């Protein structure tokens, strides 16, 4: 396992992560190097060396799967590259522009025998091919199979070039609220007196005109759901009372509510 000292608190941001492994180096510091958004991080390794099965034909390779268990990371991926046989640093995958790290088209001419590049721009599922979510665009045709994913979650418009405003799971409500679909979907508990709520993350404009829509997928007979823009100096109490600048209620599943502000 390789870890860094960095903490990842901004759930609305995309991160560009580059891992360089060079087994010929003697120290872990030189053998394992990680850059996050163009900056090299301090790393710590524990347990079995990660290179034991990496890129080996006879081994099953999983994307975002936890090493012990059957769970997977609950994140979006925009571009994933594995270069077999070369130890490349972050400059091959991004660059600084105006002080901001920007991912670029990888400067890689040959991905090696078992290398691959996933752009995640297809919606096909199942056995890997050039038309599925696991399509390899490196030219090596190392397509990955997929399972446990819906077509609606593939090739999402939310991307580093078009970063969506999302709900913020760090803003805790009265009741436990599971977030999914890249923090675009929440499910309330439905218990009496419990309020499910969240603020929109920092990618939402703080000035000017703002508009967003919310779709209700399912609603219990006794449930009452509404959506609003709440002033930063207001609090929601445990019964769900709020002070707002705009509010819309849902009567049944299938309702669509639009909320906006008219500030210039």
Model-found features: residue ranges?
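Secreted extracellular polysaccharide-interacting domains
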Residues: 1-5, 176-205
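Short hydrophobic/aromatic patches on beta-strands that form ligand-binding or substrate-lining surfaces
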Residues: 17-19, 63, 77-81, 118-119, ...
């Amino acid at each position: 396992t390789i870890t860094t000292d960095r903490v990842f608190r901004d759930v609305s941001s995309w991160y560009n992560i580059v891992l360089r492994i060079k087994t010929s180096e003697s120290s872990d510091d030189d053998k394992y190097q990680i850059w996050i958004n163009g900056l090299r991080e301090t790393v710590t390794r524990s347990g079995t060396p990660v290179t034991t099965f990496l890129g080996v034909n006879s081994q099953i390779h999983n994307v975002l799967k936890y090493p012990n268990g059957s769970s997977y990371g609950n994140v979006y991926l925009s571009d994933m590259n594995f270069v077999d046989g070369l130890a490349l640093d972050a400059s091959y995958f991004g660059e600084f522009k105006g002080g901001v790290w920007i991912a670029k088209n990888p400067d890689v001419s040959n991905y090696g025998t078992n290398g691959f590049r996933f752009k995640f721009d297809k919606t096909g599922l199942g056995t890997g091919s050039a038309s599925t979510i696991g399509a390899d665009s490196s030219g090596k045709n190392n397509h990955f199979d997929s399972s446990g994913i819906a077509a609606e979650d593939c090739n999402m418009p939310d991307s580093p070039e078009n970063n969506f405003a999302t709900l913020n799971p760090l803003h805790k409500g009265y009741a436990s609220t599971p977030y999914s679909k890249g923090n675009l979907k929440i499910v309330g508990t439905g218990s009496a007196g419990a309020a499910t709520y969240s603020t929109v993350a920092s990618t939402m404009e703080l000035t000017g005109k703002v508009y967003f829509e919310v779709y209700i997928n399912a609603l219990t007979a006794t449930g009452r759901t509404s959506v609003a823009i709440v002033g930063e100096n207001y609090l929601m109490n445990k019964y769900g009372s709020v002070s707002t600048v705009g509010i819309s209620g849902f009567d049944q599943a299938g309702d669509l509510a639009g909320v906006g502000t008219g500030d210039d």
